[in-house]
């Protein structure tokens, strides 16, 4: 083994879907890591991006995504990839290849860009880009521990069915959506509900909508 030899890593996503029995909405992705030589461990940082330009959109979906990309006439300028999240993953010792799980915690907060994007899609797939950085630990020819950084030019693609997102959210919020309010707005809404002896938040919103036509 050359003194400066270091593992050459390759990454691919083999599967993706809903993480069963998670306490909060979570997607999971099966990540295959391959190496040209034995590895002690990998401290991996996985960056996820939504490659929004890599799928078609119906007119209904364009309307649902207007807050992200503007009206149909603006899409040529505004349609772009969206940063989703970063996930740290610890990979244990392996030779040749190993399969690890990348859990991605999700939210139904529509103020979050990725959530708005998923919520605006009716069907099809979400094109995802995975970028990989971090540090690989390995032994040299004399058995001494060596450390090398992982270049961010390592990438993998995966297409996640929109149905996986909807299944996950329906499992955690059955028949419901989620709305975030500033505290002042919530206090006013709560006072309106109490003042009008309304029993649920649905009744409160309906009363306000009916009042304003």
List each model region and its residues.
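Low-complexity, acidic Ser/Thr/Pro/Gly-rich terminal tails and inter-domain linkers that flank the onset
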Residues: 1-28
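Internal, hydrophobic beta-strand segments that form the core of beta-sheet-rich folds
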Residues: 30, 45-51, 100-153
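Extended, solvent-exposed segments with strong compositional bias
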Residues: 64-119
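Short aromatic-acidic-glycine turn motif
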Residues: 49-60
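Short beta-strand elements
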Residues: 63-73, 137-178
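Surface-exposed, Lys/Arg-rich phosphate-binding patches that contact polyanionic backbones
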Residues: 183-200
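A short beta-turn/strand-edge loop motif at beta-sheet boundaries
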Residues: 35-42, 198
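Short, basic amphipathic alpha-helical segments that act as recognition/interaction helices
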Residues: 199-213
